[in-house]
């Protein structure tokens, strides 16, 4: 979720939008996922609808709520606002970029480039949980090329590598420390980066 926040902030700056509200949308878009994980067999998915229902009772801005609902196809909520389009566009891509970094010997997002992400996109066995069609459709929805989209999100993640735990291995071969405690993961990917 932190990677999605970083990417959303980058797009907000680029598009002249409110950086804080866009960042918050990225940060909270999956806040209810652990409580309501997606079940491929279920006809009615609770994530993100249950979380949005709760936030609505607390008076959260409708633009953020609509973006959160729109990032999941199965909600049927159209992505009308730029915020909603951007959230959909960056969600899967941040997971793919995270996976690309974690398979590097250095475990550093600084060692990932656009060409490498494009190459890994073609490998369906790599980061299987990442929906490549969503990545492509997201760039199209924003009216930019796929390479430009990857470049924007990658640059945002590289600029925030330390807080994302993607700054690489320390000289001793250990995962880098994340500010506030803990270490960066050395293998695997999160469900949503």
Give the positions of each predicted feature:
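C-terminal binding/interaction regions
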Residues: 125-149, 164-167
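Active-site hotspot residues in diverse enzymes, especially metal/ion-binding acidic/histidine motifs
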Residues: 6-11, 145-162
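Conserved phosphate/pyrophosphate-binding and hydrolysis machinery centered on Walker-type P-loop NTPases
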Residues: 1, 83-86, 143
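Divalent metal-dependent catalytic cores for phosphoryl transfer on phosphate-bearing substrates
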Residues: 15-124, 136
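Alpha-helical phosphate/pyrophosphate-handling elements in metalloenzyme active cores
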Residues: 1-22
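Long, low-complexity, intrinsically disordered segments
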Residues: 182-193
């Amino acid at each position: 979720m932190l990677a999605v926040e970083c990417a959303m902030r980058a797009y907000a700056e680029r598009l002249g939008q409110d950086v804080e509200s866009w960042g918050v949308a990225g940060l909270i878009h999956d806040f209810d996922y652990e409580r309501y994980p997606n079940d491929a067999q279920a006809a009615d998915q609770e994530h993100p609808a249950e979380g949005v229902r709760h936030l609505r009772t607390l008076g959260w801005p409708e633009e953020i709520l609509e973006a959160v609902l729109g990032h999941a196809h199965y909600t049927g909520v159209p992505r009308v606002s730029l915020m909603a389009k951007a959230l959909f566009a960056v969600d899967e891509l941040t997971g793919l970029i995270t996976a690309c970094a974690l398979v590097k010997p250095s475990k550093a997002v600084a060692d990932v480039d656009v060409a490498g992400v494009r190459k890994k996109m073609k490998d369906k066995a790599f980061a299987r949980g990442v929906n490549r069609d969503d990545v492509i459709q997201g760039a199209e929805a924003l009216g930019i090329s796929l390479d430009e989209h990857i470049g924007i999100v990658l640059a945002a993640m590289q600029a925030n590598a330390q807080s994302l735990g993607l700054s690489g291995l320390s000289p001793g071969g250990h995962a880098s420390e994340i500010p506030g405690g803990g270490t960066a993961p050395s293998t695997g990917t999160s469900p949503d980066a």
